[in-house]
Amino acid sequence: MGKPRPHKKKASKTREKSVLSAGGSISKRKMNEDPRKLLEQATILLQTGQADAALSIAQQALEIATSNSPAQLSSLNTIAEIYVELGEIDLARKHFLQAVELDPTGSIPESEGGGAEKFLWLAQLSELGGKDSVQWFEKGVGALRGIFRRSPLFFIAFSRASYQADIFRWEEDAESRCENLITEALLVQPSSPEVLQTLASIRISQLREDDARAALSRSLELWKDLPPEDPHVPDFPTRISLSRLLMEVSMLLEALEVLERLILEDDQSVEAWYLGGWCLQLLAEIGEAPRDPEAESNETPESKRHASLVASREWLKQSLMLYDLVQYEDERLKEHALELVEAMNKELGEEMEDDSNVEDGEGEGEEEWEGIESDSDHEMADS
């Protein structure tokens, strides 16, 4: 499952203001800032759900970046992606188009802010759709081919390409074009987790779930036993997407293991806690519980269901607590989490205040965590 097309919101005048319009001038301190460091800060904020704060810092980077420099190009792309996260599609498109003006063919290296990703985003965000989307997509693919055999970063960007598969559905050769792209990628890098996830996403869209499961299993085997700092471990967003794909093909235990590992790496991720809670709720529906070597072998489906529901509620409550704490901005996620918790409260009863402490992870909640420990497109929240 790929990243869902974001909903369009009315552009916020406040968000559109630049640093100059807000203050009239840029302070000497800001002039001395390194745009690259500011963009690193903005990226971290975006990944932790603080899109508005990320936008402010990325705009600072753009204002102090030298004209026609890699920093300016990187700033435009980062700001555009933040606007996508905020649902400000017109502003996102505007900044991606400005980035295209600086790198019209995608020949500038990704390390300098160039590459194909802006074309792939514009394909997804096209107002006209149809042929306009296809033209942007194929421009992106052309840029990707230019770096195909030179850079492993291709595979990160290629994963984005799969998200555009839907725009080809109106064409007769849609499936063959997607197949050609994924085959090309697999020939060059058959052991890339990102490419295997892309293959799984395409197989899911083709209703070939067994093939999707096989691709996801291969992707997991490549890195699941590696330490977190190993460079072969996919980045955090890629593994979030992986967990969604695993859930979509009912590989729930595998999805939960991925999410548990993500929480160990970043326990402030609203989306990881939410997906883990949802995954546990799905396990409860089929009378299953997380793997636990110490669990009694004669556990009944009812006891497994109860254990999964209790754990699910804890994960979801932690997600909701962090949602408010970091001012996360995905209303659909919050609504779905609240809906799930409400349903669990009806079955389990309202939780006592001192039963667990989700804020500091102590007490009964921590014991439940130890029992399940093994080491965001919001598309699924609509299902």
Curated annotation (Swiss-Prot):
InterPro entries: TPR-like_helical_dom_sf, TPR_rpt
GO annotation (BP), single: cell division
Keywords carried by this UniProt record: Chaperone, Cytoplasm, Nucleus, Repeat, Ribosome biogenesis, TPR repeat
SMART domains: TPR
TPR repeat start-end pairs: 35-68, 73-106, 116-147, 193-226
Subcellular location: Cytoplasm; Nucleus
UniProt GO cellular component terms: cytoplasm; nucleus
Region (Disordered): 1-33, 345-383
Signal peptide span: none
Main location (coarse class): cytoplasm
Domain of life where this protein originates: Eukaryota
Biased segments, Basic residues type: 1-12
Pfam families on file: TPR_12
Biased composition (Acidic residues): 350-374
Alphabetical list of SUPFAM superfamilies matching this protein: TPR-like (SSF48452)
Main function: Acts as a chaperone for the L4 ribosomal subunit, required for hierarchical ribosome assembly. Shields ribosomal protein L4 until timely release and insertion into the pre-ribosome is possible, once ribosomal protein L18 is present.
Family listed: Belongs to the ACL4 family.
Protein name according to UniProt: Probable assembly chaperone of rpl4
Record organism: Emericella nidulans (strain FGSC A4 / ATCC 38163 / CBS 112.46 / NRRL 194 / M139) (Aspergillus nidulans)
